[in-house]
Amino acid sequence: MSSLTGKLIVIEGLEGAGKSTAVNLVVELLSQKKISTITTREPGGTRIGEILRSIIKNPEYNNVLDDRSELLLLYAARIQLIEQVIKPALNVGQWVIADRFELSTLAYQGGGRKMNMRVINELSNFCLKGFKPDLTLYLDINPELGMIRAKSRGKFDRIEQESIEFFHRIHDTYHVLVKQNPEIMMIDANRSLDEVQSSIQSVIEEFIEHNL
């Protein structure tokens, strides 16, 4: 990504971890430094991506959408997002703040769905061609607490309706991925909002200092 002038910052975590709040905080911190930003979400962020999101998230497709189809839909949406939104923004110097990216697929499909990680990595290499975030923040939350918080938002979507064991597998896989990729910043999201935001602010301010 050295040829691109902007930066891609990704916020990761389970349902209820506070990703949307974190995205808003990062945007605010960057705006204070006069850095132009855009936000994205996965799956979605483009016209095609939002259509695919409506399929992936729709509870009507419980026990209908094959895991392999789900995986391919996610990568189709990600390719569109990268090529239509993220790269053009980075090329003009904007910083992109993304609610989920590649790590989610490894955790949810690889961990939660128990899909073959080698296959996912091969598909990732083919689709992304080495494209990676400049910074990833993983908001670590206990799955039970996360689902309590998520439930307060309203009716569960297709993914949120999965069993608690599903989310424990995702949580465990996130931890493995963080250990394998020390550049990922893990933040304890079980704490109060003020404490979580303070940790995020420290990471972002240090990142800005080294990238301006």
Curated annotation (Swiss-Prot):
Alphabetical UniProt keywords: ATP-binding, Kinase, Nucleotide biosynthesis, Nucleotide-binding, Transferase
Binding site for ATP: G13, L14, E15, G16, A17, G18, K19, S20
Any one GO cellular component localisation term in the record: cytosol
Entry annotated with the keyword Transport: no
A GO biological process held by the record: dTTP biosynthetic process
EC top class named in words: transferase
Listed Gene3D superfamilies: P-loop containing nucleotide triphosphate hydrolases
Keyword Kinase set for record: yes
Known catalytic reactions: dTMP + ATP = dTDP + ADP
Short name of one Pfam family: Thymidylate_kin
CDD domains named among the record's database cross-references: TMPK
Cysteine-cysteine disulfides: none
EC number: 2.7.4.9
MF GO annotations: ATP binding; dTMP kinase activity
Cited HAMAP family: Thymidylate_kinase
Main function: Phosphorylation of dTMP to form dTDP in both de novo and salvage pathways of dTTP synthesis.
Family classification: Belongs to the thymidylate kinase family.
NCBIfam families: DTMP_kinase
Protein name: Thymidylate kinase
